């Protein structure tokens, strides 16, 4: 059953100095670990790059972890992703730079978003990362999102 979330309250209180679509502050070590997992999944599993492919993977129930860059301009390009991830119960994390996200995804240009579909050799690390993300979410008054089960 899909959860309905009011976008006005969903985007009401971003952390200071962050774009409106950022729901919680992600520590640098967590963001770096997410980029590392994306890189490992690219080599040993399956990922998708870009906002459109990320959106499709979440909607189709394929996503295990969504990475969203914090420096996207215009921010409306990725603003729907946190809300979609909440509705579909997919873990998501913010990374500081779209350049770093593109590099971790294995492309020579920046990427606004990317998604891990199959973690490959990073499966154990992915579960540990989602636990850390849920700890950060709890500090901001958000509910935990479990790692999606295998299909």
UniProtKB/Swiss-Prot annotation:
Annotated Gene Ontology cellular component terms: cytoplasm; ribonucleoprotein complex; ribosome
GO biological process: ribosome biogenesis; translation; tRNA 5'-leader removal
GO molecular-function terms, A-Z: ribonuclease P activity; rRNA binding; structural constituent of ribosome
Keywords: Cytoplasm, Ribonucleoprotein, Ribosomal protein, RNA-binding, rRNA-binding, tRNA processing
Pfam families from the UniProt entry: Ribosomal_L7Ae (PF01248)
Domain of life, per lineage: Archaea
Subcellular locations according to the entry: Cytoplasm
Function description: Multifunctional RNA-binding protein that recognizes the K-turn motif in ribosomal RNA, the RNA component of RNase P, box H/ACA, box C/D and box C'/D' sRNAs.
Family designation: Belongs to the eukaryotic ribosomal protein eL8 family.
Listed NCBIfam families: eL8_ribo
Complex and partners: Part of the 50S ribosomal subunit. Probably part of the RNase P complex.
Protein name: Large ribosomal subunit protein eL8
Species name: Pyrobaculum aerophilum (strain ATCC 51768 / DSM 7523 / JCM 9630 / CIP 104966 / NBRC 100827 / IM2)
């Amino acid at each position: 059953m899909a959860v309905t979330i009011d976008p006005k309250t969903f985007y009401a209180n971003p952390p200071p100095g962050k774009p409106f679509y950022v729901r919680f502050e992600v520590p640098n070590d967590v963001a770096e670990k997410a980029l590392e997992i994306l890189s490992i999944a690219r080599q040993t599993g399956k990922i998708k790059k870009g906002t459109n492919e990320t959106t499709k993977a979440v909607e189709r129930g394929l996503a295990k972890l969504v990475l969203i860059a914090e420096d996207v301009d215009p921010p409306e390009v990725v603003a729907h992703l946190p809300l979609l991830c909440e509705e579909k119960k997919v873990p998501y994390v913010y990374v500081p730079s779209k350049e770093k996200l593109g590099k971790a995804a294995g492309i020579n240009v920046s990427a606004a978003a990317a998604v891990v579909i199959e973690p490959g050799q990073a499966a154990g690390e992915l579960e540990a990362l989602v636990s850390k993300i849920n700890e950060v979410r709890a500090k901001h008054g958000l509910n935990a999102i479990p790692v999606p089960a295998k299909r």
